[in-house]
Amino acid sequence: MFYEIMHRESCVAQLSTTGECRVCLEDFMPYDLVLVESDDFDERINNVTNFYYWCASRMLTLDRTYAKEILNSIGASQSVTDRERAQIALSYHCLSLLDVFWVKEENEKIRFEDINLFAHSLSNALVDIALRGHQMTVTNAHLLANDLSTGGLYPKAWVRKEDGFYLYKDGGREAVEREVLASKICRCFDCHQVLYEQGMFENEPVSISKIMTSQRYSLVTYAAYDVYCTNHDWNTLDKILELDAPGYYMMNILDYLVGNTDRHWENWGLLVDNETNQPIRLHDLMDFNRAFQQYDTPEGANCLTVGKRHLSQKDAAVEAVRNIGLNQVRQVEHTVFSEHPAWKATFEERLRVLRDAM
C-alpha cells in the first residue's frame, strides 16, 4: 500500500509500507520528515521508521495529563508504540491545526478543502476531554488531531468560535496566572507575541489565546527546523539569526525579564508561508505558564536557546540588548504585580540590568 503525503491539495511524496519512496515536491516536504529514494534495504526501513515517527508526532503525547482518557475516548490502546500512534493519526489523515500537511492512501478520493480543520468544526466534546479528563464518546474522532497535542505537559485544547480557533490551557490557577501576567508585561515590548487572557472553563481558570496558524501560515518548531538544517549541513542558529535576528533576541530578552525557564525546542520556531513552504520569521512568542521561576536572583536560569554555548538567561539577554536594544514601547503598570510584590522587585532589577547594558 502507498501513502501520499499531502501539502494542501498537492502530493509532495509517496511512500509504500515497505519503504519504497518517491519525492514529488522536495521544496514542500515537512521540515522534520526525511525520506530517501533508494533501493537499499536499510534506507527503506529508515523511510518507514521516519514516516511512522512523523505521523506519531501528530498524535497526542502519552505523558500528557489526561492523555489516557483521550485515548480511551477514541478506542485506542493505553500503551501504544510509534506505529500504533501513527495508525491513530492516520485514521484522521494526520490533520493538524499547526500546518497544512496531511496523509491519504493512494487513489483515495478526498480533498483537503473537504476535511481541513481550519474550515471544519471540531467537536465540543474534544474540548471537554482534553481539559477536564472526562470519559465520553467522541462521535467525530476523525477530527481529533495534533491540535490536542500542541506540546508540553499542560492540558490544552482548541475551541472554535465565530472568529476562529482559540487555545484554552489548563494546568491550575498558578500556571494560568503566571502566563497571563507574563503576557501583560511582554505587551510593553515590540515583539511578535501571542496574547494571553484569563478565562474560565467549568469553573476552573484557563489562559486563552487566538490561533496563530491558518491555511496561509504554518508553524514549524525549532526541533523540526533543526532536523531540516542538520540534513543540509547548516548551523540551525545561524540560519535563524539570518532569518529573524530581532525576533530571536527579543525572545531571550523577554524570557529573562519574566523568568520563563521553559523555552524548550518545541515551543519556539518558525512561521512558514504555505504558498512557498519557506520561513518568513520566527513565529509569535508563546508559552509562559512556567514564568517567574528561578526569579529570586538577577542571573536567572540557564538559557536554553543558545545552542551549545553555556549562558545564563541574564547573559543571553544582555547579549540581545547590545545587538538590538530593549525595544520597550511603554511602561509596565505597577498594578500588574499587585499580588506579587517580590516579582515586581525582581522584574525591576532585571530591567535595570538590561538598561545599564545598552
Give, region by region, the residue ranges found by the protein language model.
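Conserved protein-kinase catalytic-loop segment immediately C-terminal to the catalytic Asp
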Residues: H264, G269-V272
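Glycine-rich phosphate-binding P-loop
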Residues: T261
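Phosphate/dinucleotide-binding and metal-coordinating scaffold of catalytic cores
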Residues: M1-I253, L257-V258, L271-M358
